[in-house]
Amino acid sequence: MAEAAAKTAGAEVLSVSDLQAWYGESHILHGINFNVNAGEVVTLLGRNGAGKTTTLKSVMGIIGKRTGSIRFNGQDITRASSDKIARQGIAFCPEERGIFASLDVRENLLLPPIVRAGGLSLDQIFDLFPNLKERLNSQGTKLSGGEQQMLAIARILRTGARFLMLDEPTEGLAPVIIQQIGHTIARLKSEGFTILLVEQNFRFASTVADRYYIVEHGKVIDGFANSELSANMDKLHTYLGV
């Protein structure tokens, strides 16, 4: 189960216990429990509507009505505002990417506030995403889907956050771009970033994740390490249809 999958070398940085969340009167999360350790890539897997994105938004403080416990580096952030959570070193890259269409690539990169020391410089961003340097003066609407995703990830790397939450970063992208995103995540992990990933593309997730949690109907129903993947393929087929 999920508790057994949590044994890794890094210290715990995020602990979520009995997380409940609502959109208006709609009760979406029904007691989510999971943790993330330093330097890991942890993936939340599940079908559409399972509650994965709501979980990320709750951690980020975007969902107004939420209860339970969310602790980051030992600090209780359950009821903190999004700006205070960002200053703790957490960044969220939404599925819709949020690129400002009227701004060019440079302006999009310079817009986010630096919330902590250690944010990537433009030169470091261009080393990670060479395409963005080539499109520096292009408007957001002129970028391909893959370039928009690169820009969305690059923007949160500018903030100084070391805990990244990526929501469906491969959605709608060509296989060659998905591979590039995978290489980027692996490189960020090697540089000490901790990543919480939401994915439906299990085959992609299996190339980058250290651990998995399965989310269904607003609850974590299972969890295992990447080393246990082959032993859990039947379960994954049942849960996800992969």
Where are these regions (language model features)?
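Glycine-rich phosphate-binding loops of nucleotide-dependent enzymes
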Residues: 2-242
